[in-house]
UniProtKB/Swiss-Prot annotation:
The protein's name: Hemoglobin subunit alpha-A
Top-level taxonomy: Eukaryota, Metazoa, Chordata, Craniata, Vertebrata
Tissue expression as described in the entry: Red blood cells.
Cited InterPro entries: Globin, Globin-like_sf, Globin/Proto, Hemoglobin_a-typ, Hemoglobin_oxygen_transport, Hemoglobin_pi
Function (record text): Involved in oxygen transport from the lung to the various peripheral tissues.
One Pfam family it belongs to: Globin
Assembly and binders: Heterotetramer of two alpha chains and two beta chains.
Stretches assigned to the Globin domain: 1-141
The UniProt record lists the keyword Metal-binding: yes
SUPFAM superfamilies: Globin-like
């Protein structure tokens, strides 16, 4: 459960990300494909080269979902309900991949905003990303 301080910290980080969210989403995917190559199996039709249009487009979707979750931080489940349905019922993505994606997003934020990622903010952002992952896998059961 995200505390009031967690919510403030997460919103603060996303305010710093601002207009870079789409780029960070693509960078997160690229990092995930390199660090966790098994995740590529869900994207057999993608050009997985650095900077590909497909990675940029999907990175934009990832970023939009995270921004949507931040904008509805008190109802992440409601905000991401359709996305949860899609991943559970149609795409059938292994739930562990959301943890991988969250970890890679944390790394991207740390690279671009090292001073913003204090231990407290890091913990809050990690809790938020875990909450998003939990929502996206909730309908697997």
């Amino acid at each position: 459960v995200l505390s009031a301080a967690d919510k403030t910290n997460v919103k603060g980080v996303f305010s710093k990300i601002g207009g870079h969210a789409d780029d960070y989403g693509a960078e997160t995917l690229e990092r995930m494909f390199i660090a966790y190559p098994q995740t590529k199996t869900y994207f057999p039709h993608f050009d997985l080269q650095h900077g590909s249009a497909q990675i940029k487009a999907h990175g934009k979707k990832v970023a939009a979902a995270l921004v949507e979750a931040v904008n509805h931080i008190d109802d992440i489940a409601g905000a991401l309900s359709k996305l949860s349905d899609l991943h559970a019922q149609k795409l059938r993505v292994d739930p562990v991949n959301f943890k991988f994606l969250g970890h890679c997003f944390l790394v991207v934020v740390a690279i671009h905003h090292p001073s913003a990622l204090t231990p407290e903010v890091h913990a809050s952002l990690d809790k938020f990303l875990c909450a998003v992952g939990a929502v996206l896998t909730a309908k697997y059961r």
